[in-house]
Amino acid sequence: NFPLYGVTLSLPTIIKQLGYKTTTAQLMTIPFYATAAFLVICVSFTADRIHMRSPFMFAAYFLMLLGFALCISSGPPARTYAGVFLVLCGAYPATSCLSVLVANNLAGSYKRAVGIAMVLTMSNMGTSMACNFYRQRDAPHFVLGHSINVGFVVAGLAACSFWIWRYSRINKQRAARRAAGEHLLLTPEELSRQGDKAVTFVHTL
């Protein structure tokens, strides 16, 4: 969420530094949010249909990297505008996918509630840091802010890759255990009490 908060909170400032007046700069943010909202709906619908979210997260991360690359590179204001557009079009779907993944991969009402609360709390704590990434003296390209966010995106890619590898391995192990009939040794109530540790629980990728 650092890239999302960093760019969102500083978006009017970034656009204003491109030569637009304050009122116009506010209006120029509308296409970003309208497109991002549409993409979130499309990604959410498609991910639910195919029961996978990691491909969309990877696509979103790479879209953000491309956007930040355009922002950092020197060029006309239109290039920076396009870069920020790509960043937000990737950041919002990635954030929604992450929130749902946490809910899908934690079983047990208390565990799921605490897990979601922890993720949202840590995400919102990033606001206090992210709003300081884009300083007025770094205008108009804000290389420092964009570079810091690139680091967070790369870290997100690494974490997502590890998470997919880990959960894929667990799913394969549990599939083998189910094939051996291990789940038949327990009652449905016992399996339910095991939550996401149960051999019948399949992690969402």
What are these regions (language model features)?
Residues 54-70:
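Structural signature of the two symmetry-related core transmembrane helices
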Residues 141-205:
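Intracellular terminal tails of multi-pass secondary transporters
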Residues 1-45, 55, 95, 99-100, ...:
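Extracytoplasmic gate region of multi-pass secondary transporters
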Residues 19, 51, 74-75:
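Helix-breaking motifs and short loop linkers at transmembrane-helix boundaries and internal kinks
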Residues 109-143, 148-152:
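A late C-terminal transmembrane helix in Major Facilitator Superfamily
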Residues 2, 6, 38, 77, ...:
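Hydrophobic transmembrane alpha-helices of Major Facilitator Superfamily
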Residues 67, 78-103, 119-121:
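Hydrophobic core of transmembrane alpha-helices in multi-pass small-molecule transporters
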Residues 46, 102, 136-138:
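Hydrophobic alpha-helical transmembrane and interfacial-helix anchor sites in secondary transporters
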